[in-house]
Regions:
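Active-site-adjacent loops and short helices of periplasmic peptidoglycan-processing enzymes
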Residues: 3-178
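Intrinsically disordered, low-complexity regions enriched in small/polar residues
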Residues: 5, 35, 41, 185-186, ...
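Structured C-terminal helix/loop/strand segments within mature extracytoplasmic catalytic/sensor domains
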Residues: 6-25, 29, 217, 221-399
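Generic structural hydrophobic/aromatic packing signal, biased to beta-strands
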Residues: 37-39, 96-98, 153, 163, ...
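Short low-complexity stretches enriched in small and charged residues
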Residues: 50-55, 92-96, 107, 193-200, ...
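Generic detector of contiguous secondary-structure segments
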Residues: 54-67, 71, 192-194, 318-331
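Glycine-rich loops and low-complexity Gly/Arg-rich segments
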Residues: 61-66, 81-82, 122-123, 155, ...
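Mid-domain, small-residue-enriched loop/turn segments at the edges of structured enzyme/sensor domains
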Residues: 117, 131-257, 263-264
Length: 399
């Protein structure tokens, strides 16, 4: 099989992957795996300013289910919105009460996992980044809102991203786009910002012609093509770009910068790179949420305690319907290594959506692990005129 509509392939990356991933030739060459890879080399100048060179392998707009990777743009949009509102006493640590004004909505007034005992945008984002919490994503999406999300994404240049679903499964179809009243309260329980029940005003079209993937069982031996046009849409290229902008926002020209404060950026980076065991609020049981819980790159399916303190993976992952996605900024402070890497692979041999029978551990995660190490090994050997100063990132994890 040949790839269709996949024009973006770098000869250099093609050669590197085929030379280093000889055990995964099928995943690289067979279109049924829908493999995409985006790798960014980073070269610093004498003032530590970065320059980027992107290499792509089979990068396309073809539909892939982004799963939990949408938590990155949802979190980013929430922080941008808070800063734009610029209301007194309103910030990510302000108590956020979610009300209920529609049949599938839930009133949320407490959060035992937060330091204050109350829900906050900050604690929800921590839970998304640390353990990929779907309920936290739903609450933050409700604050952001369908219309604001797509208007702001369009302003930022991400015209194709679609955030239609909240991931918690509570509100089906278009009802997911109807967001409940949200109240922010100060320490005296006075309302500092109130957002009413909000209906979406525009039904957005899906940006690609076909979003059908696999088949859906509808009866005994009866299947239909699975249409994802009502689901979230986020290409690996756009995801990679968002991660790059967050990591390097302070280094970008003014016209390319995200409208995000550096303090909010550093907050995002800290929890993208943190292990669950390092978090105090929220706190996680180490046996359940092990170090490599959401670190597909470098660690694959291993249930590992990470001892390589010099390496940090700032990342977001997705896993559903046979799709595996990881998007990361990977650094090694000891060896002065840094690079950006995003990849998706589809490991659903029967091509049946919702079967629960996927080759994550047998094929997908080992591939992502090997892929990331092949890039790491290449970066370790690659000569650079100036070594990067990565102190800004290492200091995020100092006590």
């Amino acid at each position: 099989m040949q790839y269709v509509n996949c024009a973006q392939t770098s000869p250099f990356l093609d050669s590197l992957l085929h030379a280093s991933l000889t055990d995964f030739t099928a995943l690289l060459d067979n279109a049924k795996y829908k493999t995409q890879v985006i790798y960014t080399q980073i070269n610093r100048d004498k003032n530590n300013q970065p320059a980027f060179t992107d290499f792509k392998y089979h990068a396309s707009r073809n539909y892939i289910y982004p799963a939990s990777t949408v938590k990155l743009p949802v979190s980013l949009l929430a922080l941008i919105k808070l800063e734009e509102l610029n209301a007194k006493y309103l910030n990510r640590a302000t108590t956020m009460i979610t009300d209920s004004a529609f049949y599938c909505q839930k009133r949320i007034t407490t959060d035992s996992s937060s330091a204050s005992g109350y829900p906050t945008v900050e604690n929800y984002i921590k839970k998304m980044f640390l353990v990929s919490d779907n309920t936290a994503c739903a609450r933050v999406y409700e604050f952001v809102g369908h219309d604001y999300a797509h208007k702001k994404l369009n302003e930022l240049g991400y015209k194709d991203i679609r955030l239609f679903n909240r991931l918690d499964g509570q509100c089906p179809g278009d009802t997911a786009k109807i967001t409940p009243p949200v109240y922010f309260l100060n320490g005296n329980k006075d309302t500092v910002y109130k957002q009413p029940l909000t209906y979406f005003t525009e039904k957005l079209q899906h940006p690609i012609e076909s979003s059908r993937v696999g088949s859906l069982k509808i009866g005994k031996n009866k299947y239909i093509a699975k249409d994802f046009s009502a689901h979230n849409y986020l290409t690996p290229s756009d995801l990679h770009s968002i991660m790059k902008h967050i990591v390097f926002n302070e280094d970008l020209p003014k016209k390319d910068k995200l409208p995000l404060s550096n303090e909010s950026r550093l907050f995002m980076l800290k929890y993208l790179g943190m292990y669950p065991k390092e978090s105090i609020y929220p706190r996680y049981e180490k046996k359940i949420f092990y170090d490599s819980f959401k670190k597909y790159f470098l660690y694959g399916s291993a249930v590992a305690t990470i001892k390589q303190d010099s390496i940090r993976v700032f990342n977001i992952v997705g896993r559903a319907y046979g799709f595996l996605v990881d998007c990361a900024y990977i650094v090694d402070f000891k060896n002065n290594i840094e690079f950006l890497l995003t990849s998706v692979v589809y490991v659903n041999d029967k091509d049946v959506i919702g079967s629960g029978k996927y080759e994550y551990d047998q094929l997908g995660l080992p591939f992502l692990k090997s892929l990331s190490w092949s890039i790491y090994d290449y970066e370790k050997k690659r000569k650079k005129e100036f070594a990067p100063d990565l102190k800004e990132f290492s200091e995020l994890f100092k006590e």
